[in-house]
């Protein structure tokens, strides 16, 4: 039986491999989402979070293989239609998921990003028509070296902004939408001893003890650190436990770093698109719906970064602004295509 399966796989052409990888990517991302949610419901079961992480890595590799097979089959980088761009966006989100997880060590990253990846892959694999899932020759407007430069950078920018915005939404959930005072500044620059790299719980970040601060500074405490039972109970400001406040600070700073990564990519992508538009259509800017919403997206996240850098915003207010940006990115990427008009209308199937 196994030999027959191997023989069948060996005899598949690239189109059949793409269809198989399409379905495998959906199954793995769905499994990762369920594992992450199971780990959230039962935080004592560390294996669930580890399986969720393994699922996201597997989904990332599967989608990379799918895009590579499509690239070889079509002879061009696979970003010519909505199906291909959806899979590239999902791949970018899984990659940035791993980066955000490395920065934060919080399972909230997977709880929030895995459903988005699953939804994107399900939409591409199950909703889009089959003829769009087959590689087609490039339309004349896309036969340019600017295709990879512009579209790739824009989709990576969308991925970074979406993951950063999702972590801002996580911040609002953790703090229950309350205004809280975070110990770090808006830039996330603060002397903090390293957190223990154990498997995180819902409140995975703990406050450092005085002894750990001394050890981090290269000093030794004159006496052993008191145990948690010996320490007096700490009041929880704003009625939120200390552990949640520490987790909220991690989410806030990680969100800020991802948006700080996505914004320059968005800027470069818009500039590259303007240069390409001038070559293809004779004008740098034509107020096409996609161009207009790209500008709106840029302004929203420019306001976010301006408020954090120059006004010192942190916590609830920038999180609300980033949450607004989450919806704006989706309108820019997908929503305007429902209009069925404009220079970017080839991205939809109606």
Curated annotation (Swiss-Prot):
Keywords: Cytochrome c-type biogenesis, Membrane, Thylakoid, Transmembrane, Transmembrane helix. InterPro entries: Cyt_c_assembly, Cyt_c_biogenesis_CcsA, Cyt_c_biogenesis_CcsA/CcmC. The keyword Transmembrane helix applies. Pfam families: Cytochrom_C_asm (PF01578). GO terms for biological process: cytochrome complex assembly. GO terms for cellular component: plasma membrane-derived thylakoid membrane. The chain crosses the membrane at residues 23-43, 47-67, 82-102, 108-128, 153-173, 258-278, 293-313, 319-339. It is a multi-pass membrane protein. It is found in: Cellular thylakoid membrane. The keyword Lyase does not apply. Its main location: membrane. One of its GO terms (molecular function) is heme binding. May interact with ccs1. Belongs to the CcmF/CycK/Ccl1/NrfE/CcsA family. Required during biogenesis of c-type cytochromes (cytochrome c6 and cytochrome f) at the step of heme attachment. NCBIfam families: cytochr_II_ccsB. This is Cytochrome c biogenesis protein CcsA.
